[in-house]
Each structure stands twice: as C-alpha cells, then as structure tokens.
Amino acid sequence: IRVNLNGSMEPEVWTPASVAGLKQLATYAKDKNINIIVENHGGPSSNAQMLAEVMDKVGMENCGTLPDFGNFCIKREEGDYYSSKCLEEYDRYKGTKELMPYAKGVSAKSYSFDEAGNETRVDYPRIMEIVLDAGYEGFVGVEYEGSELSEEEGILATKKLLERVLE
C-alpha cells in the first residue's frame, strides 16, 4: 500500500508523527503480508534525508519507500504540497540515492523529451545508475506528467527511454 506522509510542515512535528503512524500501519499490515511504501510526495517527505531518518526509526521490513524521480519539491510558493510553484527542491539524484536502501518500488517520472528521446528534466542514465547501484531488482513504474504528448505516448516514450538506458 502506497501512502503519503502529509501533516505538519515542521520537522519536529512531522518526524515523530510519521514514525508513529507508519509503525502502527506497518504493524497492522505485517501479519497480512502487506508492504507499506512511502512516496516522496511533497513537503517534508520530499526531503530524502528526513524520510530516510523516518524509515530508520520505523525499522520494519515491510515498510519502505517509493522513490519518485520528480517529487523532490520541499517548499512551494503557497505552502501547499502539490499545486503552486516550487521554491525549494531537494537534489533528485542525492535524494534517490538516500531513499534506495528502503525502496520497495521506483517511480520513473517524466515530463518532456528532446528529439533524441531523452527526458529533459531528469538525467535518466544517471538516476538509473543510482537505482541499479543500490542493488534494486524490483519494479520500475512509469509516470508521465507532461503535456506535449498524450498520456499513452508519454508512458511509451518513458518506457522506451528506460529500455534504452538499461541495455
């Protein structure tokens, strides 16, 4: 089950609340053979160092992360989680590396492509090297959030890019 760690934007409130909530949820899910996965998805959860600290404190095998290549905005103009302009972004490569030890899945986010089929915001060879160097062998989901291609075309372009990078 994928969850978000929303709530307070204040680390001293967010961290203990996140640990407590995840421990309770993961404990309930454990006997049911269910993994709880947290996506970096705005606010403090997009600060990979903080999210990794939460994962360390939870310390349960069935609780992990879903690193999303495109969700490292930690502060937005309007103070919201998703909609307004990003003012502060955590380094996506550093963040992915910090979240990979806990990864139960990976989200390959894409927005736009150049003429050669490369994603214009994310260096896919670099970020996939981080994923592979972590020893990850699980699923890589595709998430297209661009507007230049249809949803299907964007997903297929991302899949093609991943296949090329992983050759």
Regions found by a protein language model. Name each.
Residues 6-10, 72, 111-114, 147:
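A short, flexible beta-alpha/helix-coil linker loop
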Residues 34, 133-138:
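A short helix->loop->beta-strand "cap" motif at the edges of active sites that frequently abuts
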Residues 24-27, 133, 160, 164:
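A generic structural signal for well-ordered alpha-helical segments enriched in polar/charged residues
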Residues 103-116, 137-151:
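Active-site clefts of carbohydrate-active enzymes
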